[in-house]
Amino acid sequence: MRKIIVLILLLVVAGKAFSQPRDYNRDYRKHFFWGIAFAGTYAKMKMELDPVFWQRTDSIQSIRPQGQAGGGFGGSVAYRFGKYWELKTLTMLQLHQRNIQYAWQHTPGPNIKIETISFDIPLTLKYRSDMPNNTRMYVLGGVRWSHDFQSNQGLVIGESKPLVALKANTYYYEVGAGMEFRLDFVDLSLELKMSNGLNNALIRVPNSYYSGSMASIYPRLFSISLMAQN
């Protein structure tokens, strides 16, 4: 959070130092925009239990997904068409983690960590308002492909091994909203976004206590991003 605040202050100070008047017609003269982004994330999952879980006669009692914070950085490219619309991609390298807590009848079970280092390419459609007083709002929606470099999809997982693997490639739909602030040389934007998985990402080992007790996992990701765009 401190790094984000410092970045905002540096951009503001740099703009004032050059004392160049703002280009109010920049949006209407340009069609292509590029920028950089830093994001804070909260990774969760939607989990469904397999019917075999309810038929178990062993000591396993419950399985609970847990969310964890993460982050990422990347670059954006946008194409403006019409007065209010943009087609945008925000390529990101993201690091986050999801946990699964197992509870046994007499003792706490293992807390399994699913760590992710992903390369994400979204394609979103953005609708923005006018920009009175150098500020405007926007909404967006689209789809995203995510490739996980940490995936254990190709690993042979034994039935008793405390490991839950997710597929290397997952797909999301996402919606969000944000606010843009015009400075002398760049537009700063603060964006909130929610991404929900479309495909079942679980690699299920049928006789496993761990992944075999679940039918599906759909990853979810909530993010807040700070972007600077030319």
Language model: regions and residue ranges:
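Short glycine/proline- and aromatic-enriched beta-strand/turn motifs that initiate or cap beta-hairpins
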Residues: S19-G70, Q229
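Extracellular loop and loop/strand-boundary signature of outer-membrane beta-barrel proteins
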Residues: R22-D23, D58-I63, H106-I112, E159-A165, ...
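Outer-membrane beta-barrel channels and translocator barrels
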Residues: R29, G82, D130-N134, R182-V186, ...
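Residues that define the transmembrane beta-barrel architecture of outer-membrane proteins
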Residues: K30-F32, G67-G71, E115-I121, T135, ...
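Residues on the lipid-exposed face of transmembrane beta-strands in outer-membrane beta-barrel proteins
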Residues: I36-G40, G71-Y79, L93, I121-Y127, ...
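Outer-membrane beta-barrel translocator domains and adjoining extracellular loop/strand segments
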Residues: M47-F53, I100-T107, Q150-G158, A201-S208
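Glycine- and aromatic-enriched membrane insertion/assembly motifs of diderm outer-membrane
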Residues: F53-P108
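Predominantly the C-terminal beta-signal and adjacent terminal strand-loop region
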Residues: A165-V175, M179-N230
